[in-house]
Curated annotation (Swiss-Prot):
4-amino-2-methyl-5-(diphosphooxymethyl)pyrimidine binds at Q40, F41, R42, E43, K44, N75, S113, K142. Binds 1 Mg(2+) ion per subunit. Keywords: Magnesium, Metal-binding, Thiamine biosynthesis, Transferase. Condenses 4-methyl-5-(beta-hydroxyethyl)thiazole monophosphate (THZ-P) and 2-methyl-4-amino-5-hydroxymethyl pyrimidine pyrophosphate (HMP-PP) to form thiamine monophosphate (TMP). GO terms for molecular function: magnesium ion binding; thiamine-phosphate diphosphorylase activity. Its cofactor is Mg(2+). One of its GO terms (biological process) is thiamine biosynthetic process. Belongs to the thiamine-phosphate synthase family. This is Thiamine-phosphate synthase. Gene3D superfamilies: Aldolase class I (3.20.20.70). The keyword Metal-binding applies. It catalyses: 2-[(2R,5Z)-2-carboxy-4-methylthiazol-5(2H)-ylidene]ethyl phosphate + 4-amino-2-methyl-5-(diphosphooxymethyl)pyrimidine + 2 H(+) = thiamine phosphate + CO2 + diphosphate; 2-(2-carboxy-4-methylthiazol-5-yl)ethyl phosphate + 4-amino-2-methyl-5-(diphosphooxymethyl)pyrimidine + 2 H(+) = thiamine phosphate + CO2 + diphosphate; 4-methyl-5-(2-phosphooxyethyl)-thiazole + 4-amino-2-methyl-5-(diphosphooxymethyl)pyrimidine + H(+) = thiamine phosphate + diphosphate. The gene is thiE.
Length: 212
């Protein structure tokens, strides 16, 4: 059964997010040692890997996560997630309906991106373990990100469905988490804040401190 505490510090990363000269495996290892609670492999963009290279990297990262008993989630790529037996899948509003994923992913974690109340009410949540709500703030990590909805969107959706685990996403740094936690989020999902941190251990520790 999915535990909402897995969302406390949710790291999302692909090779396109890693600073030049750094290796994603080493960054993930540092993040795991620092105490991240969930990892999502999101390999997207003009410089990203595909095919066999992407699959081999995914397997390396999956093994790393399992060494630390941290769930490994794949973004969007259902075929890859199935092939490597990932712990779950995260899908967006533009993807095929969630029910079809659930049928292929029995006993796996399924996450869904939701940006506002309208998307919430139009989403099939029966098979969803958690939702990613955002963007909270303006973000540089996603070129196609929508306008920020702010931390209050978490409170709005929690009022509608208090038992549904929710993780905040978009433009989050270690310095703007407090209002997110105050509005009832179960955790934060970040890309650049960890991938480009000068001290990953310190960054993750500070993030975790808001969700004790």
């Amino acid at each position: 059964m999915f535990n909402s505490s897995s969302l406390n510090v949710y790291f999302i990363c692909g090779t396109q997010d890693v600073p030049e000269g750094k290796d994603i495996r080493e960054i993930l290892k540092q993040a795991l040692e620092a105490g991240i609670t969930l990892f999502q492999f999101r390999e997207k963009g003009p410089t990203s890997l595909d095919g066999v290279e992407k699959e081999h990297l995914a397997i390396d990262l999956l093994k790393l996560c399992h060494d630390y008993q941290v769930p490994f989630i794949v973004n969007d790529d259902v075929d890859l997630a199935e092939k490597i037996n990932a712990d779950g899948i995260h899908v967006g509003q533009d993807d095929e309906n969630v029910k079809s994923f659930a049928e292929r992913f029995k006993d796996k974690i399924i996450g869904l991106s939701i940006g506002n109340e309208k998307e919430y009410y139009h989403s099939d949540l029966e098979h969803v373990d958690y939702i990613g709500v955002g963007p909270m703030f303006a973000t540089i990590s996603k070129n196609d990100a929508n306008a920020p909805v702010g931390p209050s969107m978490i409170a709005t959706l929690k009022n509608i469905n208090p038992s549904l685990p929710m993780v905040a996403i978009g433009g989050i740094t270690e310095d703007n988490i407090e209002p997110i936690a105050q509005n009832g989020a179960d955790g934060v999902s970040v890309i650049s804040a960890i991938a480009r941190s000068h001290n990953i251990d310190k960054t993750v520790t500070k993030m975790k401190s808001y969700f004790k």
